[in-house]
């Protein structure tokens, strides 16, 4: 609501009404995101990133058939496309697999759900604050709506897991607390998501709790850098987030005597969370 108040004198976004209009929006969103990441020093852009994003640009969907995510994308695909950080990670794992054979393949359960969903959800808002929508203030409203939907979805799933609500009642929370009634347009997505998260306790909430952990990690990392008298750079943070683990450093820590080990700076729990490498093939959701 505060974002809408800020933008009250601006014209509203207009949804794409034809394949040509959607394709133009999607192409513009990809170009805008990649330019932003590269020119604003957000992250070192690998050759695999733009092709990975282009492979998931989507296509025009008639208004009466759009579910929540594609409703937002037909106004501006960029907020949803930033969540596609997932595809950047999967492309990187294809070209730079984890050195440990134990962590190269898919696990029976995606224990990294908080890491990957939290990061994908977190960068949506981080990129907004870093200036991605400075030339399209109304698009900021979509970022908040996407986050509100994840929060409503996760809250409903918590009630269901606690046996305080049926899945249908949890879905009602999901619908009622998503802004603009955009979860009431297409019931298949609602049923699918509530069923998915009912079967995986903690997954539905991981989008929001994982986002918090990413933000906490950013704060912890920035403080560590500044305490060393160095200048914080956002690109360094995301590059380290994307980097494979330094196995030699970890090995040295394990082999060092106890007294020497104390000389290493303590790594916060959130930093450890963020620096996990996600195994290839894990399930990734919007």
Task: Describe these PLM feature segments.
Residues 1-286:
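Long, His/Glu/Asp-enriched segments that create or flank divalent metal/ion-associated functional microenvironments
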């Amino acid at each position: 609501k505060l974002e809408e108040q800020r933008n009250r004198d601006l014209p509203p976004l207009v949804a794409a009404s034809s394949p040509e209009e959607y394709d133009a929006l999607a192409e513009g969103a990809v170009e805008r995101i990649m330019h932003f990441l590269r020119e604003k020093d957000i992250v070192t852009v690998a050759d695999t990133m733009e092709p990975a994003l282009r492979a998931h640009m989507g296509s025009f969907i008639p208004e009466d058939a759009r579910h929540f995510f594609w409703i937002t994308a037909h106004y501006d695909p960029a907020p949803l496309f930033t969540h596609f950080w997932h595809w950047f990670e999967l492309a990187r794992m294809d070209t730079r697999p984890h050195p440990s054979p134990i962590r190269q393949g898919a696990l029976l359960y995606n224990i990294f759900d908080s890491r990957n969903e939290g990061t994908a959800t977190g960068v949506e808002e981080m990129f907004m604050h870093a200036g991605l929508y400075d030339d399209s203030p109304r698009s900021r409203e979509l970022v908040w709506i996407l986050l509100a939907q994840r929060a409503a979805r996760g809250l409903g799933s918590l009630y269901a897991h606690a046996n305080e609500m049926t899945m249908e009642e949890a879905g009602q929370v999901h619908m009622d607390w998503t802004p603009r009634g955009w979860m009431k347009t297409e019931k298949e997505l609602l049923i699918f998501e509530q069923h998915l998260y009912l079967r995986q306790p903690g997954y539905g909430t991981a989008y929001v709790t994982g986002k918090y952990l990413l933000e906490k990690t950013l704060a912890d990392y920035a403080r560590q850098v500044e305490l060393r008298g160095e200048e914080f750079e956002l690109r360094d943070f995301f590059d380290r987030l994307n980097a494979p683990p330094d196995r030699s450093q970890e090995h040295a820590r394990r082999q060092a005597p106890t007294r020497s080990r104390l000389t290493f700076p303590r790594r916060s729990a959130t930093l450890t969370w963020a620096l996990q490498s996600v195994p290839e093939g894990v399930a990734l959701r919007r």
